[in-house]
Structures are given as C-alpha cells and as structure tokens.
From Swiss-Prot:
Residues 58-77 have a biased composition (Polar residues). Expressed predominantly within leaves and cotyledons vasculatures. Mainly observed in fully expanded leaves, at the base of mature inflorescences, in senescing leaves and cauline leaves, and, to a lower extent, in hypocotyls and rosette leaves prior to flowering. This is Senescence-associated and QQS-related protein. The lineage of its organism: Eukaryota, Viridiplantae, Streptophyta, Embryophyta, Tracheophyta. One of its GO terms (biological process) is response to oxidative stress.
C-alpha cells in the first residue's frame, strides 16, 4: 500500500507540474531566453568576428552598435515586447 501510494504521488505531481510548467514555460522562458540568448550571441559574435576578418572596421561599428546601442534598446524593447513577463 505504501509503495503504491508513493508511486502514485510522484506521477500525479509530475503530471500536474509538467502541465503547469509548460503553460508558464512558454511565457517565462520566452523573455529570458531571448534576452540571454541574444546577448550571448552578440557578445560571442563580436569577439569572434573582431579577430578573424574584421579587425578595426567591424570592431568600431559593431561594438558601438552592439554594445552601446544594443544594450540599452534591447533591454527596453524586450520588456515592452514581453508585457506578460
């Protein structure tokens, strides 16, 4: 009886949690994933691109556009775009 009850509890809890998480996951993961993923991609691209082909031109242009202008508007736009979060 005890074993059966324990097995039934996690199954039901997991099922409920999964369903609830899925609903919130869509909205919750949407904002952070976009912001974090985009930020990481930009930073990585900047460092990676800055060394190989583009040395000075891309660095000045990309850095200014991606770092200064990107950090501000991206954060503001992300918040405005995701009013649910």
């Amino acid at each position: 009886m005890s074993f059966r009850k324990v097995e039934k509890k996690p199954t039901e809890m997991g099922r409920n949690m999964t369903h609830e998480k899925s609903d919130s996951d869509s909205d919750n993961e949407g904002a952070p994933m976009t912001v974090g993923g985009y930020t990481e991609f930009v930073a990585r691209s900047d460092s990676d691109w800055d060394e190989p082909v583009y040395s000075g031109k891309a660095r000045s242009n990309y850095n200014l556009t991606g770092t200064a202008k990107g950090t501000g508007p991206i954060n503001s736009f992300s918040r405005k775009h995701f009013p649910n979060y």
